[in-house]
Design a protein with these regions (language model features):
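Sec-dependent bacterial lipoprotein signal peptides
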Residues: 1-16
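Bacterial signal peptide processing site
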Residues: 17-22
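Post-signal peptide N-terminal segment of mature Sec-exported envelope proteins
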Residues: 27-49
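Post-signal-peptide N-terminal segment of Sec-exported extracytoplasmic proteins
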Residues: 41-65, 75
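Core segments of small alpha/beta cavity-forming domains
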Residues: 59-140
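Structured, amphipathic secondary-structure segments that form assembly/contact surfaces
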Residues: 105-223
Length: 226
């Protein structure tokens, strides 16, 4: 789902988040209960390796897009309120963009979470699928979500949200037949790093203003290998 683009410098991303350039897409852990312990001189039980592994594991959120299409988000363990809001925006964008593709452009909800140049970028991405009579099926996975930088404060605050995207479980389809095309694109094989510059909209909510990505063998994208 991605073409060959170059990730711009961080300063440019942050400045774009605070003021109004090329889009490319292509989603707290529960601790196990313990038995009550008397509050006398007992030493608190030490967590088992299994408990530690569970507490370190990301929480998965599965978002249904359409029959046979979904976005899975691996949430960080304890995001603050702003990080949570930004992740929700990026999740809604990915799910919404795929929903626009499978609905043949009828669903335009993805445009609710973008502004400035990101509007044209997102519209062009969806339009390319429609023009070529292409659709998708499968699962896109978003992981290693991280706010890598912030600038400004209050209503003027901007931020860069990085996310690793794995679409290897997706297939590009011929929308007229519903069957996978013979030549599958690179994004169905290798993960890539997506960066979204975000800023506060007039209603106080976060919006995506700029997209950039890094694809393998770029050093930044290597962090998405696992």
């Amino acid at each position: 789902m991605i073409g060959v683009r170059v990730v711009i410098a961080l300063v440019m991303l942050l400045s774009a988040a605070c003021t109004p350039s090329e889009a490319q897409p292509f989603t707290p852990v529960d601790l196990s209960d313990t038995s009550p312990v008397e509050t006398s001189s007992r030493v608190p039980a030490r967590p088992s390796p299994q408990d530690s592994a569970r507490s370190a594991a990301p929480r998965e959120e599965k978002v249904g897009v359409a029959p046979g299409v979904r976005v899975v988000v691996e949430w960080p363990a304890a995001p603050d309120a702003d990080t949570t809001a930004m992740i929700e925006v990026l999740r809604d964008y990915f799910a919404g963009a795929f929903r626009a593709v499978v609905s043949e452009g009828r669903d335009t909800g993805y445009l609710d979470v973008v502004e400035y140049d990101a509007v044209d970028d997102a519209s062009s991405w969806v339009g390319a699928f429609l023009d070529e009579r292409r659709s998708v099926r499968g699962t896109a996975r978003l992981y290693a979500l991280n706010v890598s930088a912030v600038s400004g404060s209050g209503d003027d605050r901007g931020a860069q949200l990085d996310v690793c995207v794995d679409e290897s479980k997706m297939r590009l389809l011929d929308s007229s037949t519903g069957k996978p095309v013979a030549r599958q694109p690179d994004w169905t094989r290798k993960p890539f790093l997506q960066s979204a510059a975000m800023g506060r909209a007039a209603d106080g909510g976060w919006r995506i203003r700029l997209f950039r990505h890094a694809k393998l063998p770029d050093e930044r994208a290597k962090g998405c290998l696992r």
